[in-house]
């Protein structure tokens, strides 16, 4: 194959190249190590010595010409690809906007945040603590003796003999009192764990517990705080009542009910005056300081607020249910 034939073939084929893949095939065929132009140069040794300079010059000129045409074609293809890419990215700003799908808060989270807002507006700080607790913080410091049913392994998730998943957020109150001097007013929201699962109980649920320590606090202060909370959470006509109960960390202790129109009296939380033994465990003088504490299940409040009858709906991840609140 002579130089003129290769030149003619290269020009004709290059004109037909329309994409990067075809361009690469052309490069290999004509400019590659085993390409046709390279083969022409290798043929130089077969020519008589007097013909070699002119032939070599002609082949080099052909290579330069084909390389130049190749570069021009490559640039054309790259520009074409860039135009196509830009065309795909073109935005018609005259078109109407498209609404983006967004999620929304889980009903339990919404109620948790509402509870926090209510108590923060009443002067309480929000404090959090670890979900894996020592038995001392979870039970002993809260005046809960070893024989108490709450400490049974059938009711609590133990990790070791001394560590467990907290059964309430009251340990946060202990940690706070160990770190701060009174007076204090805190709430401690978070996850808690108990071995229970039915229509009204979950093995993992959410609590908000509160503690207020100051001089000369009484049940009257506790009742006022809970009345204010009930009115803000359930409406200005909500009423509460306190029924005697027992908790190892408060004395006296109460179950607190709220009266809701259409439902009657419904239990919403437990509360009481802090037991002096709890103060002694954290280094507070019970002769100088008094305090009240309360705790509520957020799922329970959510069920009452939204009229939900089965607590398990909160964890079934049914979008139809969750999107209703």
UniProtKB/Swiss-Prot annotation:
It catalyses: tRNA(Phe) + L-phenylalanine + ATP = L-phenylalanyl-tRNA(Phe) + AMP + diphosphate + H(+). It is found in: Cytoplasm. One of its GO terms (biological process) is phenylalanyl-tRNA aminoacylation. It comes from Thermotoga neapolitana (strain ATCC 49049 / DSM 4359 / NBRC 107923 / NS-E). This is Phenylalanine--tRNA ligase alpha subunit. HAMAP family: Phe_tRNA_synth_alpha1. Tetramer of two alpha and two beta subunits. One of its GO terms (molecular function) is magnesium ion binding. CDD domains: PheRS_alpha_core (cd00496). Binds 2 magnesium ions per tetramer. Keywords: Aminoacyl-tRNA synthetase, ATP-binding, Cytoplasm, Ligase, Magnesium, Metal-binding, Nucleotide-binding, Protein biosynthesis. Its main location: cytoplasm. One of its GO terms (cellular component) is cytoplasm. Its EC number is 6.1.1.20. Its cofactor is Mg(2+). It comes from the Bacteria. Mg(2+) binds at residue 251.
């Amino acid at each position: 194959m002579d130089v003129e034939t290769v030149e003619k073939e290269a020009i004709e084929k290059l004109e037909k190249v329309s994409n990067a893949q075809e361009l690469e095939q052309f490069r290999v065929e004509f400019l590659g190590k085993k390409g046709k132009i390279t083969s022409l140069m290798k043929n130089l040794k077969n020519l008589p010595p007097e013909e070699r300079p002119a032939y070599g010059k002609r082949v080099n000129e052909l290579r330069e010409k084909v390389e130049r045409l190749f570069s021009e074609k490559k640039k054309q293809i790259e520009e074409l690809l860039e135009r196509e890419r830009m065309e795909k990215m073109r935005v018609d700003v005259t078109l109407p906007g498209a609404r983006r799908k967004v999620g929304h808060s889980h009903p339990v989270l919404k109620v948790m945040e509402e509870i926090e807002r209510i108590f923060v507006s009443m002067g309480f700080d929000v404090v959090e603590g670890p979900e894996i607790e020592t038995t001392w913080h979870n039970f002993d410091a809260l005046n809960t003796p070893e024989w108490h049913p709450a400490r049974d392994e059938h009711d609590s998730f133990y990790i070791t003999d001394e560590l467990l998943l907290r059964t309430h957020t009251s340990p946060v109150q202990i940690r706070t009192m160990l770190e701060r001097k009174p007076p204090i007013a805190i709430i401690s929201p978070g996850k808690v764990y108990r071995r229970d699962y039915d229509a009204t109980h979950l093995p993992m649920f959410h609590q908000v517990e509160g503690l207020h320590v100051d001089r000369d606090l009484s049940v009257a202060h506790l009742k006022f705080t809970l009345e204010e909370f009930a009115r803000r959470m359930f409406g200005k006509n909500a009423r509460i009542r306190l029924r005697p109960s027992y908790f190892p960390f408060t004395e006296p202790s109460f179950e607190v009910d709220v009266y809701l129109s259409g439902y009657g009296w419904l239990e919403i939380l437990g509360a009481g005056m802090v037991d002096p033994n709890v103060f002694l465990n954290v280094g507070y003088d019970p002769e100088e300081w008094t305090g009240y504490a309360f705790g509520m299940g957020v799922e329970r409040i959510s069920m009452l607020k939204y009229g939900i009858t089965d607590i398990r709906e909160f964890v079934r991840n049914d979008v139809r249910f969750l999107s209703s609140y």
